[in-house]
Each structure stands twice: as structure tokens, then as C-alpha cells.
């Protein structure tokens, strides 16, 4: 079994490609199950956010796994494989695990150290686990990765001033206007990204914020939390006419702000307007950027305007990368030890069989034993067996991660009289349990 990651992100694909390759939240479970039915795919988790679509999979062979991951992607999004392929990246084994650690800790994000991705990775894993597309390897890997990322954000300063892409959006507004005092802001959308934007706007001197959402009750909840106003969705044009800054982040699959309508609106508007589109797919038609005084930024534009990270943060990143290397080695040592689990179980079962034979012999030779005495003897005998096996099992685990591990394990089986049949029975039971 091998760990293989395939995906595209803000490093490899522009937004006009990424927005076509986003898994809808309502279709996540179906996508996971469909992928699991592909040849070579044994486990899978799909991570789909505004900046990345990545599949982490366990495959039986790297070469066939790569092909079937690409085929699934092309079929799911109804695109030619040749059109998608130039934007895809693949990471195998240690490189794949290393990449997942960096992604989850926010080291691969548009905004270094952002925390939102941790929740997104955790959610992706939980959905896959509930759907039944994860197994021994990915369950272990994602638990370790999430735990590590939590420690990173708790014990380092990597996430200072870096909450999410929403943070970058607010920084753009500050760079353009300097002070945001007395600016009128309209937020379109009442989801997580809008909430994060409001958190970043807090303390910026803005007193006039209007939230517009198709479902008005969601806007009202957010407005109450941040002392903002609620605008009617059907009156969006009126609110845009008065706005200085507009942040747009909805789950709409088609643009809700269109070039023709904005051209007419801007002809009536006396001042310029900054529009930051952090939706994916994009919520604002790209042609709006050609309208005079209509300053449009999308997610990719944000990368070029966020200030460079300080030397201190770069130092922390270097330290984290070194720590991640240690975590990756630890994971693969654990994986190697998985290979000796059937041997350990076979050894324990052989010892328990010997105990059972001995207890039966005792019962026949000492018919006067009470039930309590018989049980106590059995407990003590089991304790002796466990103590005697503790050191050999520990040594076996150590052997499994050393050079010539296969030869050492074969010697171990010969010493304890374990046959290939003994081990094969356990391996078959494990395979049936996983399936």
C-alpha cells in the first residue's frame, strides 16, 4: 500500500481553473464513494477549499493509482484529462505525508499560518471517515496531522495576524484607503468567510457595515454578532451605490455581480468602489475589472498584495519544517510496524492455545480444583505469558524498521515456531475486517 496525493492549488492553477474543479459540499459523500470504487484506490479523503482541491489516497500501486485519480477527476468534472493534467501535482509516500502536514499547519496557504485550513482538513477527514472511505492508514495519518497543526497554532506565533484569506482581503482595503474610518462596507454572503472578514474588520474604525444575504435570517444572526446592519438582497444595487468597499463571498455557482449591471451602476456612482471577491467559484464577473473606478480583486490577486512575512515568521517556518520531517519519519516507522501485527497476533494466539491446552490438562489431573482456583491459575498463567512475550514483541517492532527487516522477521518466526499458515490466517482475518 502506498500514500498518494493528487491535486491543484493556488501554486499550480489560476482561479479560472480552480473554480471549475471544486467539489460541492452536497456531493462530497458521493464523490468519496465513487472514487473508492475506482481500481487501485483503497482509501481516500477529498480536501476542497477556495485555494485547493486535493485528494489524499491509499493505493495498491503508484502508477495505476495516479491514472485512476486523474480519470476520476476528469470524469467527475466532465473535463478532458489532457486539459486538467497540466495543473495537477502528485506527491508520493513521504512527500505526500510531508505536504499534508504543511497544508494543515497553514504553511502552504496563501496567507502563511492561516488557521481556517485546519478546520477544513479536519472536516474533510470527518466526512470521509463517516462515509467509510478511510481505513487504518488515513485514520492514523489525519489524526496525527490535525493534532500537530493544533500544537503549531497553540505554541508558535506563525498565525499572528493571519486568520484566513479574509484577513488578506481586509489588508487590501487598508492598503488602498489607508484608514478605513468612515468607509461604508457591504458584505455579500453570511458564511464563514464573511464572519472571518468581520473579525478582521473589528477595531478598524468602521462603523457602517451592511450584510446582505439571500437568506435574510443568516445575515441577521451575523449582524447581531458584529453590530452591523442588514440589507435586503433584492435591493443590492442600492447598497452597492453607496458602498466604498464590497466583500463578496457566497456559495453561488454563477456570478451574482455582472458586468452590464455594474457598468450602469458605476455611471451613477460619484466615487470609486473596491470590490474583493473571495468566493470560489467567483461571485463577480471578471469583465467588471474593466469598468472605470471599479477596483476588483479576486483570491489570486490577494497573494500579490499581502505584505511579506517577517524574518521571525520565516524562522518559525524553518523550525516547523524540521519538526515535520521528524513527524513524517515517525509515521512511516509506525506503518512498517503494521507489517508485523499479524506476526504478533499469531504469536499471542499460539501462546494462548498452549495456555488452553495446559489448563485442560490441569483440570483433568487436579479434579479437586474449585472454580475460583481454576480461574486464578488461568489469570496467573496469562500474566506470565504476557510478561514473557513483552520483550520479544518489543524487539520485533524494532526489527521491523531496521535494514534487512524481512530477514530478521523470518528468523523471529522460526525461533517461535510460527508457520506461514499461522500468519496468513491472521492476515486474512484483518483483510476481511477492513473490507
Swiss-Prot record:
Record-linked SUPFAM superfamilies: Glutamyl tRNA-reductase catalytic, N-terminal domain, Glutamyl tRNA-reductase dimerization domain, NAD(P)-binding Rossmann-fold domains
Keywords annotated in UniProt: NADP, Oxidoreductase, Porphyrin biosynthesis
Stretches assigned to coiled coil: none
InterPro entries attached to this UniProt entry: 4pyrrol_synth_GluRdtase, 4pyrrol_synth_GluRdtase_dimer, 4pyrrol_synth_GluRdtase_N, GluRdtase_CS, GluRdtase_dimer_dom_sf, GluRdtase_N_sf, NAD(P)-bd_dom_sf, Shikm_DH/Glu-tRNA_Rdtase
Site label Important for activity, positions: 99
Family matches, as Pfam families: GlutR_dimer, GlutR_N, Shikimate_DH
Pathway assigned to this chain's UniProt record: Porphyrin-containing compound metabolism; protoporphyrin-IX biosynthesis; 5-aminolevulinate from L-glutamyl-tRNA(Glu): step 1/2
GO molecular function terms noted in the UniProt entry: glutamyl-tRNA reductase activity; NADP binding
GO biological process entries: protoporphyrinogen IX biosynthetic process
List of residues binding NADP(+): 189-194
Annotated residues for binding of substrate: 49-52, 109, 114-116, 120
EC number(s) stated in the UniProt entry for this protein: 1.2.1.70
Active-site positions on this chain: 50
Catalyzed chemical reaction(s): (S)-4-amino-5-oxopentanoate + tRNA(Glu) + NADP(+) = L-glutamyl-tRNA(Glu) + NADPH + H(+)
Domain free text: Possesses an unusual extended V-shaped dimeric structure with each monomer consisting of three distinct domains arranged along a curved 'spinal' alpha-helix. The N-terminal catalytic domain specifically recognizes the glutamate moiety of the substrate. The second domain is the NADPH-binding domain, and the third C-terminal domain is responsible for dimerization.
Family label: Belongs to the glutamyl-tRNA reductase family.
The protein's role, per its UniProt record: Catalyzes the NADPH-dependent reduction of glutamyl-tRNA(Glu) to glutamate 1-semialdehyde (GSA).
HAMAP family: Glu_tRNA_reductase
Assembly information from the UniProt record: Homodimer.
Extra remark: During catalysis, the active site Cys acts as a nucleophile attacking the alpha-carbonyl group of tRNA-bound glutamate with the formation of a thioester intermediate between enzyme and glutamate, and the concomitant release of tRNA(Glu). The thioester intermediate is finally reduced by direct hydride transfer from NADPH, to form the product GSA.
Protein's name according to its UniProt entry: Glutamyl-tRNA reductase
Native source organism of the sequence: Listeria innocua serovar 6a (strain ATCC BAA-680 / CLIP 11262)
Organism taxonomic ancestry: Bacteria, Bacillati, Bacillota, Bacilli, Bacillales
Amino acid at each position: 500500500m502506498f500514500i498518494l496525493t493528487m491535486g491543484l492549488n493556488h501554486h499550480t492553477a489560476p482561479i479560472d481553473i480552480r473554480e471549475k474543479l471544486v467539489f460541492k459540499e452536497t456531493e462530497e459523500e458521493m464523490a468519496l464513494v465513487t472514487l473508492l470504487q475506482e481500481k487501485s484506490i483503497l482509501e481516500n479523503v477529498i480536501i476542497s477549499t477556495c485555494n485547493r482541491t486535493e485528494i489524499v489516497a491509499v493505493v495498491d500501486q503508484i502508477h495505476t493509482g495516479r491514472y485512476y485519480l486523474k480519470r476520476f477527476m476528469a470524469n467527475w468534472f466532465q473535463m478532458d484529462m489532457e486539459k486538467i493534467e497540466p495543473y495537477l501535482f502528485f506527491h508520493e509516500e513521504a512527500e505526500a505525508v510531508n505536504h499534508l502536514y504543511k497544508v494543515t499547519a497553514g504553511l502552504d496557504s496563501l496567507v502563511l499560518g492561516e488557521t481556517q485550513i485546519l478546520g477544513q482538513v479536519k472536516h474533510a477527514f470527518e466526512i470521509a471517515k463517516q462515509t467509510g472511505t478511510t481505513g487504518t492508514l488515513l485514520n492514523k495519518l489525519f489524526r496525527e496531522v490535525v493534532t500537530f497543526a493544533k500544537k503549531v497554532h497553540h505554541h508558535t506565533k506563525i498565525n499572528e495576524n493571519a486568520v484566513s484569506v479574509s484577513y488578506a482581503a481586509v489588508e487590501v482595503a487598508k492598503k488602498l484607503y489607508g484608514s478605513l474610518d468612515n468607509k461604508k462596507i457591504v458584505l455579500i454572503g453570511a458564511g464563514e468567510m464573511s464572519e472571518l472578514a468581520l473579525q478582521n474588520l473589528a477595531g478598524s474604525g468602521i462603523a457602517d457595515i451592511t450584510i446582505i444575504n439571500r437568506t435574510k435570517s443568516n445575515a441577521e444572526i451575523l449582524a447581531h454578532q458584529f453590530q452591523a446592519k442588514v440589507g435586503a438582497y433584492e435591493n443590492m444595487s442600492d447598497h452597492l451605490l453607496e458602498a466604498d468597499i464590497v466583500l463578496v463571498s457566497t456559495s453561488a455557482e454563477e456570478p451574482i455581480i455582472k458586468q452590464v449591471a455594474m457598468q450602469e451602476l458605476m455611471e451613477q456612482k460619484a466615487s470609486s468602489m473596491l470590490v474583493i471577491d473571495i468566493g470560489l467559484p467567483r461571485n463577480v464577473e471578471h469583465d467588471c475589472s474593466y469598468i472605470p473606478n471599479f477596483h476588483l480583486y479576486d483570491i489570486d490577486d490577494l497573494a500579490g498584495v499581502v505584505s511579506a512575512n517577517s524574518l521571525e515568521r520565516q524562522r518559525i517556518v524553518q523550525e516547523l519544517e524540521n519538526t515535520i520531517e521528524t513527524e513524517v519519519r515517525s509515521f512511516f516507522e509506525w506503518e512498517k510496524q503494521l507489517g508485523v501485527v499479524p506476526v504478533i497476533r499469531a504469536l499471542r494466539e499460539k501462546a494462548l492455545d498452549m495456555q488452553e491446552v495446559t489448563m485442560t490438562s490441569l483440570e483433568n489431573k487436579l479434579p479437586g480444583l474449585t472454580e475460583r482456583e481454576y480461574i486464578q491459575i488461568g489469570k496467573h498463567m496469562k500474566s506470565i505469558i504476557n510478561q514473557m512475550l513483552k520483550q520479544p514483541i518489543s524487539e520485533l517492532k524494532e526489527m521491523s524498521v531496521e535494514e534487512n527487516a524481512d530477514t530478521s522477521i523470518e528468523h523471529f518466526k522460526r525461533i517461535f515456531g510460527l508457520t506461514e499458515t499461522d500468519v496468513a490466517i491472521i492476515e486474512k482475518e484483518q483483510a476481511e475486517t477492513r473490507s
